[in-house]
Amino acid sequence: MGLVMWLRTGVLMAILTGLLMGIGYLFGGPNVAFIMFLFSMFFNFITYWYSDRIVLSWYNARIVDEYEAPELYAIVRDLAQRAGLPTPRVAIIPSETPNAFATGRDPKHAVVAVTQGLLRILNRDELEGVIGHELTHIKNRDILIGTVAAAMAGAIMQLAYWARWIAIFGGFNRDRDDGGDIIGAILVAILAPIAAMLIQAAISRSREFLADEGGARISGKPHALASALMKIEQAVNYRPMREGNPATAHMFIVNPFRGMSIANLFSTHPPTEARIERLRKIAEEMGIYF
């Protein structure tokens, strides 16, 4: 499994390099394409080593210790021991939208982040189910490719935004000599966000089913995880997340963003109803009925 994740991460980095070189060639020819190649090498390095910090910074997440959040920290520590994992760092996101995600490049450098809203609406059993889900992502090493994909998707959309305005104003300054930059800007504005979302879609939705099963078995409470998923889904529909970056949607236990933006054209998660039904079957296997 580790080798597959490494290969998929390498493919994502190669895709980013190709996209950046293509944008550079479109707006500046071979010289700019080469500069973008060098930049992509630097960005790939930063993404691998620091993507978790990048993602956490998008949500103003704060690392806490066992003295600041004793109950949450104890749950993470105890379930990590049960899963045979080193205890990950714990972060709290200042958002009232209930949700959670895991990030990091490997189990030794992992972080489990939860929102204030999640801590507010879930009971202890439900919280254990959610933490178990995130720990399964860590154990299965989903966090590397998920975090790298989020950082890359965010970078692609941001670079496309900059390139669009640079091309438009640059085109005007050259008296619209051939309109090429304007056409290029339009193409980038349309295609780059789609490329970013396709990168997100490359993160298999089946990973969520596996993480649900793992979370149910680690916590021993599939019914509580099912209840948590329902609560989160209902709360997100009522109060979708406004802060952060849609490029991270696939990282959360439930997609926290709603609406008709490009970020929602590609589904990042299986339907919550299907996940709950699978948890019901897992519960029956464990002799639990709900």
From Swiss-Prot:
Its EC number is 3.4.24.-. It comes from Thermococcus kodakarensis (strain ATCC BAA-918 / JCM 12380 / KOD1) (Pyrococcus kodakaraensis (strain KOD1)). Its cofactor is Zn(2+). It comes from the Archaea. Keywords: Cell membrane, Hydrolase, Membrane, Metal-binding, Metalloprotease, Protease, Transmembrane, Transmembrane helix, Zinc. It is a multi-pass membrane protein. This is Protease HtpX homolog. The chain crosses the membrane at residues 5-27, 32-51, 143-163, 182-202. The lineage of its organism: Archaea, Methanobacteriati, Methanobacteriota, Thermococci, Thermococcales. One of its GO terms (biological process) is proteolysis. It is an enzyme of class 3 (hydrolase). Belongs to the peptidase M48B family. One of its GO terms (molecular function) is metalloendopeptidase activity. It is found in: Cell membrane. Binds 1 zinc ion per subunit. GO terms for cellular component: plasma membrane. InterPro entries: HtpX_protease, Pept_M48_protease_HtpX, Peptidase_M48. The active site is at 134. Zn(2+) binds at residues 133, 137, 208. It holds the Pfam family Peptidase_M48.
